[in-house]
UniProtKB/Swiss-Prot annotation:
SUPFAM superfamilies: Enolase C-terminal domain-like, Enolase N-terminal domain-like. InterPro entries: Enolase-like_C_sf, Enolase-like_N, Enolase_C-like, L-fuconate_dehydratase, Mandel_Rmase/mucon_lact_enz_CS, Mandelate_racemase_C, Mandelate_racemase_N_dom, RHMD-like. GO terms for biological process: amino acid catabolic process; carbohydrate catabolic process. This is Mitochondrial enolase superfamily member 1. It catalyses: L-fuconate = 2-dehydro-3-deoxy-L-fuconate + H2O. Could be sumoylated. It comes from Bos taurus (Bovine). The gene is ENOSF1. Its main location: mitochondrion. Keywords: Isomerase, Lyase, Magnesium, Metal-binding, Mitochondrion, Phosphoprotein, Ubl conjugation. Substrate binds at residues 24-26, 34, 220, 252, 276, 305, 355-357, 386.
Amino acid sequence: MVHGRVSRLSVHDVRFPTSLGGHGSDAMHTDPDYSAAYVVLETDAEDGLKGYGITFTLGRGTEVVVCAVNALAPHVLNKDLGEIVGDFRGFYRQLTSDGQLRWIGPEKGVVHLATAAVLNAVWDLWAKQEGKPLWKLLVDMDPRTLVSCIDFRYITDVLTEEEACEILRQSQVGKKEREEQMLAHGYPAYTTSCAWLGYPDATLKQLCSEALKDGWTRFKVKVGADLQDDIRRCRLVRNMIGPEKTLMMDANQRWDVPEAVEWMTKLAEFKPLWIEEPTSPDDILGHAAISKALAPLGIGVATGEQCHNRVIFKQLLQAKALKFLQIDSCRLGSVNENLSVLLMAKKFEIPVCPHAGGVGLCELVQHLIIFDFISVSASLQDRMCEYVDHLHEHFKYPVLIREAAYMPPKDAGYSTEMKEDSVKRHRYPDGEVWKKLLSAQGN
């Protein structure tokens, strides 16, 4: 029985100085400090359980998300958890439809990142009270209960509530076997850890060599800053991994539409499976034009990590603008909105390959994609989940990768809880790590 009245909501600005090592660097984000607005929900329940929620940021600006979380707090405080999850669609709409706050959205930007952090904490607490990892909580729900968590506003022209229920009902066949498959073998992953744009060749070679030894067969390279440098780096990686392994490329929104087509035509010799975020995440028709132009070269378009909401995904699918759909556990409105996108992707038969990495993104999105395989898509064809090998040591329940696959979490919750000492030391600007760095910069 889900219970307890929310008695406290706190939010922390947690930042890791990843820019010092070039980790996470790409053509648009050259010096990111991987960060998070970290939400903690407490209730008056005797079990003492807490819910932890995250939304991912790149350093500066995290304080703005923290402000937005605090602005949403009145919609959460003193609410009964059982009533929240009993009408989760209504609660989602309450958060996203505040008559004043929605003006700085609606359902996009900073206020939506804050919504994700709050809702992620609610889902974590719900799963903990049920004693299940989040993926299992979702898998065990009947179709009608799952669908009741989704706000279908603005997407009923593509997916109705009844259609969503029918998709889930049809996927009941073979669920038990697929769950056993996940528990035994895990969900296939690819690595982005080897080829950040800021890495020198020596680092790239070393990390690529280590990844091959560890059994990785799918690799992603950052591109978009300099064509000749991209050609050199892609040739280096392709030569190292060989012709049979899978290579993807990611431009992180660097190009205009004609530039994307021209650039990728020149990189086609390296046989990339996809080009990720070739242009503005808001340009649906631009993505469609790029997708059409690159199809004869065998290159698909992948996007989604900075798509604001389910409506953008709806239009990308309608316009046939992408071959691979990339959900993000913190950009959309938490599990609720991601459920709607997974179901739309199933209807359009587009594979979902989630965005991960960051602070806690791997920990969160593993639950969604494992659920997707068991209860929605029922397929691993052309599907894989991103993995980045850093910052997991700061989480109480870090991801487990075995033979280049995500192994299903067994601990109750959404895997969002960070270690207290890590939060304390990396809190900005008063944590020990930042006091030292800011002091050194001041000198």
